[in-house]
Amino acid sequence: MAFNIGALFAPTAAVKIKEYAETVLGYSSNDAYHFSFAVACASLIVSMAIYYAFRSTFKHVEGGERKAGADIKEEELTPEETKARVVALCLVFAVVIFFWMAFHQNGLTLTYFADEISAKTSEGVQSMAFDVWNLVTIIIMVYAGFSCFQSKTAKAKLISGLLVLAGAAFLGWKYTQVSGSIDVSAPIYQQFNPFYVVALTPVSLAIFGSLAAKKKEPSAPRKIAYGMIVAAAGFAIMAFGSFGLLTPDAQKEAGDAAMFVSPNWLISTYLVLTFAELLLSPMGISFVSKVAPPKLKGMMMGGWFVATAVGNMLVRVGGFLWGYIPLWIVWSVFIVLCLLSAIFMFAMMKRLEKVA
């Protein structure tokens, strides 16, 4: 959660730093972005310094230390049980590869789309989505709304309700300040995924909490399979919005005849892909932690991140397809991969749920 709160502000900060380097320092667009990377590098160093400076304040929650005299009993598994669990985890890792390959197109083809195909300007209500402070206000309203219904005391309900009203008033005032159109740069789209993660987490918890109370909550493997289907739906939005568009190569050569589409296609896609991420990522890590044989838990958790790394490496497939192939075909490749992965998960479901 904290990671995504920071990620929400990062795109706006990067764009502002780049604009400062261009307008104030006089650097070209091709050179100005280096300043954003420089600030990111410095920020990482500062983050590490903060971590080590204040490490003593959270040392009590760090793992890896065993108290003197502590007798920790590990679950004993037969060789057959160990093999079944390892095989099940490897099957999940195989699916995870294709999810991250598709999901992390947000750093490649989806950004290409934002840069080359999406409209460069936005106006009206839509333009408000590109202001990070509007997104922060919506997040506050979501959490305040949940607090209003879940709080036990009248005072807490009142405070939560006032926060919702204050947020609505702020957004209304911001709308009155909208005039004309604003410029939209490709990097700013990266704020939508962390925004959706932070805003939708309480919604996700409420849904699955309600299902759990009714004893109808899907198992972790089923959630992963559903996540692959939802990811396919996200790219289906892109495929539908790309019908009839020029190929990226033709778009570059078209000049004034170039075709641009509404930013809403990307904004909607990021929403659906975030739902997929919420279904798959935390559930997958939880599944690995629960199913991994005790003596192999560290290795199996490493396997999850190896699968993530392989998926990130395969993101390049989108780059190979970008340029001369119709866009709807590019997105269809990821639709097919996600659907095949979901079918594979459902085919292996009994084996996966047996060890879960």
Model regions and ranges:
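Loop-to-transmembrane helix entry/capping segments in MFS-fold secondary transporters
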Residues: 1, 33, 183-184, 263-264, ...
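Glycine-rich segments within core transmembrane alpha-helices of 12-TM secondary carriers
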Residues: 1-22, 36-47, 130-136, 193-202, ...
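Intracellular loop-helix junctions on the cytosolic face of multi-pass helical membrane proteins
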Residues: 15-182, 204, 208-214, 352-356
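A membrane-interface helix-boundary motif in multi-pass transporters
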Residues: 16-42, 217-222, 253, 257-261, ...
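Hydrophobic positions within alpha-helical transmembrane segments
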Residues: 189, 269, 300, 304, ...
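Structural signature of the two symmetry-related core transmembrane helices
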Residues: 199, 219-237
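Hydrophobic core of transmembrane alpha-helices in multi-pass small-molecule transporters
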Residues: 247-279
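Intracellular juxtamembrane helix-capping segments at the cytosolic ends
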Residues: 279-292
